């Protein structure tokens, strides 16, 4: 396993935000795997991340819901807030066990103010629209976010799971700092259009699920040890008919990792890091051991030939099954109506 060393800093986007080259995705600290966690242990993990140089912390008001922001609010007391870049999200809601989406101005403002209270901060560094509300022109949503920037409640604006045309329309209203998307060895469709668009416009790229929701960390057998409440059990790629095919990719990555004296998780994460200095992956974990391992991925060096080998491993035919549940909005269905259609 590659050892953890210093975490370098990168410029995320072209609007002035500087972050650690790797962030911490905090979703799993509060939700979605069905296990019970101890708050003091989670706060200790967050502090360990910050003290190790991982300063971009990523949360959302839907995680918990709300409890993840409250957890970070506790963790960032006593001077810790000044050491981090704090990112949260709005726009994805859970009501009566059903997902909903809102991007209207009144909701944007109310969601921001509620997040500020839960986090115990006066300003959010990076505020994303978590999923696009396809009933509201993106210009309207970004227009309200622009007001929040002007009022000092948020510093930078981002989108998550947005298509290239929506990104362009949003960026024309107020410059975007980052777009968050799923990017890993087994989720590469964003390379066709979204990544080039972000780079053309000077928008930073934040890669979530860079380890394939744990697939590259533990291999295909980890599905057997998942708690019954773990949402990943229901995802298409983890169904047995697809897993039998997908495990071949893991085996290839594992074999290459052994040659490089690192773990498959570190190799998969290093592949994301090597995509460019405009990319910040945000792997999540609730274990300090895994956090240290993820930081160690920054020390894994890949040659042009090794990157080409990994690219070949992760070709589209190497993976079977959709990456997310069919009921969740992704960039593939994130177009919004024209601004001319909006009546407030």
Curated annotation (Swiss-Prot):
This protein's UniProt keywords: NADP, Oxidoreductase
CDD domains for the chain: AKR_AKR13D1 (cd19145)
Gene3D superfamilies registered for this protein in UniProt: NADP-dependent oxidoreductase domain
GO-annotated molecular function: oxidoreductase activity
Annotated binding of substrate, by residue: 130
EC number of this enzyme: 1.1.1.-
Pfam family, one: Aldo_ket_red
Domain of life: Eukaryota
Catalytic residues (positions): 63
Binding-site list for NADP(+): 209-219
Coiled coil: none
UniProt family annotation: Belongs to the aldo/keto reductase family.
Protein name: Probable aldo-keto reductase 1
């Amino acid at each position: 396993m590659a050892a953890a060393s210093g975490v370098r800093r990168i410029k995320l986007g072209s609007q002035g935000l500087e972050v650690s080259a790797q962030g911490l995705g905090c979703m799993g600290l509060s939700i979605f795997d069905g296990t019970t966690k101890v708050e003091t242990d989670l706060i200790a993990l967050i502090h360990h991340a910050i003290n190790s140089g991982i300063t971009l912390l990523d949360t959302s008001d839907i995680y918990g819901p709300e409890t993840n922001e409250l957890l970070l609010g506790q963790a960032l007391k006593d001077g810790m807030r000044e050491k981090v870049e704090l990112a949260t999200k709005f726009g994805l809601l859970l009501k009566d066990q059903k997902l909903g989406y809102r991007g209207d101005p009144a909701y944007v403002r109310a969601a921001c103010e509620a997040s500020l209270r839960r986090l115990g901060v006066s300003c959010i560094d990076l505020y994303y629209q978590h999923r696009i509300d396809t009933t509201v022109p993106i210009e309207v949503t970004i227009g309200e976010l622009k007001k929040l920037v002007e009022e000092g409640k948020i510093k930078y604006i981002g989108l998550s799971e947005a298509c290239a045309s929506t990104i362009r329309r949003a960026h024309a209203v107020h410059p975007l700092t980052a777009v968050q998307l799923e990017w890993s060895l087994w989720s590469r469709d964003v390379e066709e259009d979204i990544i080039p668009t972000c780079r053309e416009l000077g928008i930073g790229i934040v890669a979530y699920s860079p380890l394939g929701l744990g697939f590259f960390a533990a291999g295909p057998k980890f599905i057997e040890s998942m708690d019954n409440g773990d949402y990943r059990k229901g995802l298409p790629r983890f169904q047995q008919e697809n897993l039998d095919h997908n495990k071949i990719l893991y085996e290839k990555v594992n074999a290459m990792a052994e040659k490089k004296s690192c773990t498959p998780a570190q190799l998969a994460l290093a592949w994301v890091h090597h995509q460019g200095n405009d990319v910040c992956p945000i792997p999540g974990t609730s274990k300090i051991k895994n956090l240290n391992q993820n930081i160690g991925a920054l020390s894994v060096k890949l040659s042009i030939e090794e990157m080409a080998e990994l690219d070949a491993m992760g070709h589209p035919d190497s993976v079977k099954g959709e990456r997310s549940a069919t009921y969740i909005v992704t960039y593939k269905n994130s177009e919004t109506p024209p601004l001319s259609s909006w009546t407030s």
